């Protein structure tokens, strides 16, 4: 189902050029690649009675327990939407209700949904750029190719930058400084290097104009979710009163993942570089699942452990979220309203716990 709304027109937001197809494709490829790398960061968790969401290119995706909606503002000022029912992975496969496995299932579904939302927004931005020069079929095929190419490239980049490089440098440092050459020392250096690379990556991309706009939509998503959770009428004016950093943001989750990884890697009985590298890849689902359980456990103790686990993520969200404009907040509200309408149409009930 798709809908349109024209309000709060903005100046054109696409910074691509039309100087040639190769230039456009390369810029678009790099833009998609960066967005895919950011998917876990831009994701906000959804619980049984709450809503969650994610920023996409020039828009926001909002989801409720059984539905989701992507809203994107085109350069003309129109808001285009796509809303669909959403079945939880744990409802179809009960095994994903078990501890640890439920965290893996939740992240996999969130990434899959994030890719669909990103695909939708990328298609509409491509239409803005191409106009009527290409058929819809051609645009879809180009977008699908670019998306899948970016998924593969992003996965390889993730493994290389956050698994291979930190371990390689930590092993080299351990040979250079014998005191850091123990298993514990190498794992500590490995974790610190990984954290520095992550923070450096965030800082560098935050300087990009396109990504800064995504961070503004990320802030809009958080403000609107806060507005909804407060019980106040969800309006642009009410949403703008809230802060942009939210405790359920994927930024907080990723930091917990990094700390959990350091603890689990320290238990590995391997000494060879190859064995440690393979184990780091193989243990990714375990690390994700354990991190999810820690966040879930801490969420029930909001004044104690939850505050400790989420505070670094809240600080980091000063980078990954930025104050949105009223027009950007309106897009987030539009996505939320459509997701809620579909949720209620399916017999669901949205209440605040």
Identify the residue ranges that each predicted region occupies:
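Juxtamembrane "helix exit" motif at the C-terminal ends of alpha-helical transmembrane segments
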Residues: 120-121, 154-179, 257-279, 288, ...
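Hydrophobic alpha-helical transmembrane segments
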Residues: 152, 188, 192, 255, ...
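Hydrophobic alpha-helical membrane-embedded segments
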Residues: 67, 98-117, 190-214, 288-300
């Amino acid at each position: 189902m798709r809908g349109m709304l024209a309000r709060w027109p903005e100046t054109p937001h696409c910074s691509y050029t039309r100087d040639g197809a190769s230039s456009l494709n390369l810029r678009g490829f790099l833009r998609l690649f960066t967005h895919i790398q950011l998917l876990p960061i831009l994701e906000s968790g959804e619980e049984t009675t709450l809503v969650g969401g994610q920023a996409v290119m020039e828009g926001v995706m909002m989801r409720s327990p059984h539905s989701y909606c992507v809203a994107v503002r085109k350069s003309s000022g129109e808001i285009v939407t796509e809303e669909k029912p959403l079945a939880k992975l744990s409802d179809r496969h009960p095994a994903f209700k078990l501890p640890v496995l439920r965290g893996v299932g939740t992240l996999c579904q969130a990434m899959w949904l994030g890719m669909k939302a990103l695909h939708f927004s990328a298609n509409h931005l491509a239409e803005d750029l191409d106009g009527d020069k290409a058929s819809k079929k051609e645009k879809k095929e180009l977008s699908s190719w670019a998306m899948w190419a970016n998924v593969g490239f992003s996965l390889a980049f993730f493994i290389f930058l956050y698994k291979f490089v930190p371990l390689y440098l930590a092993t080299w440092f351990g040979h250079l400084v014998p005191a850091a050459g123990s298993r514990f020392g190498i794992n500590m250096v490995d974790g610190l290097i990984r954290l520095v690379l992550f923070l450096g990556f965030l800082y560098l991309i935050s300087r990009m104009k396109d990504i800064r706009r995504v961070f503004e939509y990320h802030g809009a998503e958080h403000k609107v979710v806060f507005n909804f959770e407060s019980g106040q009428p969800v309006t642009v004016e009410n949403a703008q009163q809230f802060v942009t950093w939210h405790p359920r943001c994927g930024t907080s989750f990723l930091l917990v993942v990094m700390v959990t990884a350091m603890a689990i890697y320290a238990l590995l009985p391997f000494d060879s570089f190859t064995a440690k590298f393979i184990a780091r890849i193989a243990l990714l689902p375990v690390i994700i699942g354990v991190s999810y359980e820690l966040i879930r456990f801490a969420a029930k103790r909001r004044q104690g452990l939850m505050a400790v686990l989420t505070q670094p993520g809240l600080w980091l969200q000063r980078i990954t979220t930025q104050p949105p404009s009223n027009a950007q907040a309106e897009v987030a509200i539009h996505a939320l309203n459509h997701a809620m309408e579909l949720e209620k149409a399916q017999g669901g009930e949205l209440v605040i716990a």
